[in-house]
Amino acid sequence: MSIKIGILQADDVLPNLAVQYGEYPAMFQQLLHAANGDTDISLEFVTYAVNAGIYPSEIDEMDAYILTGSKSSVYEDAPWITQLAEFVRALHSRKKKLVGICFGHQMVAHALGGKTSLADVGWGLGVKETSPNNSTDLLGSQPFKLIYSHQDQVVELPEGTVVLASTDICPIAATTLGEHILSFQGHPEFYPDYANDLYEIRRERYPAEIYKAAMASLQTDADQLFVGALMIDFCRR
């Protein structure tokens, strides 16, 4: 079985980090190949730099799409964000498989009638336990850990959206809509070394205690491969 996955790239990795870690599409490819292991599923990837206005000529070029994170906010008045919201609505209307990550999670809500805003609780950083609420069996019942890096949160849901999980500061940390959209506020594509270097570069943005706790949390293993396997299974259904 082959799955063609379009990666909708919504940002560029900081140049000094990209040299070591690659761009976001490479991180997702690494994650999903590792999660796929030695199964009989063949994964094919194509990147579309949506932050530069690049899109597939036809939605059905791909079997599924992943919408990456971004330093931008979905509520910014930028032409590329407006165009991206329109594309998300098109995917939804066609019931095309879409997995949204961080900014992508927020864009799904924003584009389909929900709301994302700056979180009153401030930054969500570091490895955080993510607790399923058992609304479906999609995530199972056991808490899992992901690396987080966000200041915005989804605060209102589009009609029909089901909340799958939450963290200590993020009530809407994972969602699903129908059988074709899945989203996570956390970053399954992030690994500790990259998060460590990213937080260090951005440390002046963070309150000292949040930064300190986030850096310490990176000593805790996260469940990237668990979520990566979920993403593959979701895309193949």
Predicted regions and their residues:
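N-terminal beta1-alpha1 cap of cysteine-dependent amidohydrolase-like domains
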Residues: 1-86, 90-94, 211-237
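Cysteine-nucleophile active-site neighborhood
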Residues: 68-135
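Catalytic metal-binding/acid-base residues of hydrolase active sites
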Residues: 49-51, 104, 152, 189
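Short glycine-/acidic-enriched loop or helix-start segments at secondary-structure transitions
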Residues: 17, 76-78, 109-111, 158, ...
